[in-house]
Design a protein with these regions (language model features):
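Residue-level signal for inorganic ion chemistry
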Residues: 27, 80, 119, 178, ...
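Short acidic-hydrophobic, aromatic-tinged amphipathic segments that line or gate anion-handling sites
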Residues: 2-8
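N-terminal catalytic cores of NTP/NDP-binding nucleotidyl/phosphoryl-transfer enzymes
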Residues: 9-72
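A glycine-rich helix N-cap at a beta->alpha junction
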Residues: 72-89
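Glycine-rich, highly charged phosphate/nucleotide-binding loops
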Residues: 68-76, 100-106
Length: 249
């Protein structure tokens, strides 16, 4: 997967099919979107694109003081690449960018700069200044060059999957339910020095203090999350960018 930071100097993508969003957690609902994007790209022998934002818009707009995120940008890149996406475009989210109207975002950025031909949206996705744009507003506008598709809600056990629901599960140490909603184990990407984890993103969602069964790059270990101080493993190994996955018991 190719990763691009910014939208002003992009290559010409081949018949691109895209989706846009924060994709926090890259959960089961997101997987439905990603599968559709890949499918529509293949129909035209094109490329799949995910457009996301960094930092998370809520951080910049300060709309939620206690915000915690399921995935850091590095974790998101790892999960999207594993999902088979061809290209990830990371738009730097600023207060100035937040004032971009929905029509400008579609016309200037998605169509003008990325050349998007097919756009796949979640059922509740909003975009543009004050979240003024959505699937309905796009359907009613005249965009003859843009194919538009909407993905309906995705549920597990009768419950709609969302990043908010998964955050609550992780917060309450319900790691097995979180994994079912995500479609993969909850994970941390961290630098490990003599067993101690360094997590640079202060917004990363961690489960509460306790002892957890995890794998570190596929090796079963125990993870200890203290009330204070850094999380640490029961083995004193050192590795940059280690993938710590919670075992769903």
């Amino acid at each position: 997967m190719k990763v691009f930071h910014g939208i002003d100097r992009l290559p010409a993508f081949r018949h691109p099919a895209a989706t846009v969003g924060s994709f926090d957690g890259v959960h089961g609902g997101h997987s439905e979107l990603l599968a559709a994007v890949r499918r529509f790209a293949r129909e035209r022998d094109g490329e799949s694109i995910v457009v996301t934002f960094s930092p998370h818009p809520r951080i910049v707009l300060e709309t939620q003081t206690d915000l915690r995120l399921l995935t850091t940008l590095d974790e998101k890149v790892w999960l999207l690449e594993r999902a088979g996406i061809d290209n990830l475009v990371v738009i730097p989210f600023t207060r100035e960018f937040s004032r971009t109207g929905s029509a400008d975002f579609i016309r200037r950025d998605l169509i003008g700069k990325l050349g998007v031909e097919t756009l796949v949206m979640g059922y509740n996705h909003h975009f543009g200044h004050n979240k003024e744009g959505d699937y309905g507003s796009l359907r009613s506008s005249e965009r003859p060059t843009l194919r538009l598709y909407r993905i309906e809600p995705f549920s597990v056990g009768g419950e709609k999957v969302s990043s908010t629901v998964v955050r609550s599960l992780v917060e309450h140490a319900e790691m097995a339910r979180a994994a079912r909603m995500l479609g993969h184990p909850y994970l941390l990407m961290a630098d490990v020095a003599r067993g101690s984890l360094r997590i640079d993103d202060p917004y990363k969602q961690l489960p509460p203090a306790g002892e957890y069964s995890v794998t570190a790059d596929g090796v079963p270990v125990r993870l200890f999350i203290p009330s204070e101080g850094a999380p640490h493993l029961d083995r004193p190994f050192t590795k940059e960018k280690s993938i710590i996955e919670f075992t769903a018991l």
